[in-house]
Design a protein with these regions (language model features):
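Eukaryotic all-alpha helical interaction scaffolds
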Residues: 46, 66, 86, 120, ...
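Short secondary-structure boundary elements
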Residues: 1-4, 8-12, 19, 23
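Tandem amphipathic alpha-helical repeat scaffolds
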Residues: 19, 56-69, 92-109, 122, ...
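Alpha-helix C-terminal capping/termination sites
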Residues: 28, 35, 48, 68, ...
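Short, well-ordered secondary-structure microsegments
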Residues: 2, 6, 26-100
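The canonical alpha-helical register within tetratricopeptide repeats
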Residues: 8-11, 41, 48, 61, ...
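Tetratricopeptide repeat
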Residues: 5, 39-42, 75, 79-82, ...
Length: 168
């Protein structure tokens, strides 16, 4: 693995993330499955060579795929490793915390999911990053929905108000 290969695989992961939400999702899941070992090697190379932001981006881009294919534990390991590395981009960190919280929730680790989403929300609010604020609020809402419908509704409504206030 070298930098050129790692960056090409990061670009592939970016394209795959977009395509997983479209009509060719099954085709792209298969492509990701076939290249999983290469993607894991690229993630390790990026992290090991100080490209922590790119490693976090890759882990975040692949989190949904890993969740959908029953590999949430792998996604959490990748995100934990990226979060443990020194990150200079707080926005990427806020997104990584959200993604990790989502995977924790899927694993039934509700307390950890709430903590991760809460940390994401705190950081996103500090940055004024409205899209990530809305994501973190939705993540919290999904977790607390199991226990407190009114609180989940309030979080969801706040997320909607936040999204309405963005240009995205």
């Amino acid at each position: 693995m070298d930098e050129r290969e790692a960056r090409a695989l990061l670009s592939f992961a970016e394209e795959a993330r977009r395509k997983l939400a479209g009509p060719d999702a099954g085709v792209w899941r298969d492509r990701l499955e076939r290249r999983h070992q290469e993607l894991e090697a690229a993630f390790g190379w990026l992290l090991g060579h100080g490209h922590t932001g790119d490693a976090q981006r890759m882990a975040g881009l692949l989190a949904e795929f890993l969740r959908l294919t029953g590999q949430a534990a792998t996604g959490r390991v990748w995100l934990d490793r990226a979060l443990a590395a020194a990150m200079v981009d707080d926005r990427l960190k806020a997104v990584a915390l959200y993604e990790n919280g989502t995977l924790a929730s899927w694993q039934g680790a509700d307390e950890e999911a709430c903590s991760l989403h809460g940390r994401s929300l705190h950081l996103a609010r500090r940055l004024g990053d409205k899209p990530t604020i809305a994501l973190a609020l939705c993540g919290l809402a999904r977790v607390v929905l199991r226990e407190d419908l009114e609180w989940a509704r309030a979080l969801g409504e706040e997320a909607l108000r936040t999204v309405d206030a963005t240009d995205d």
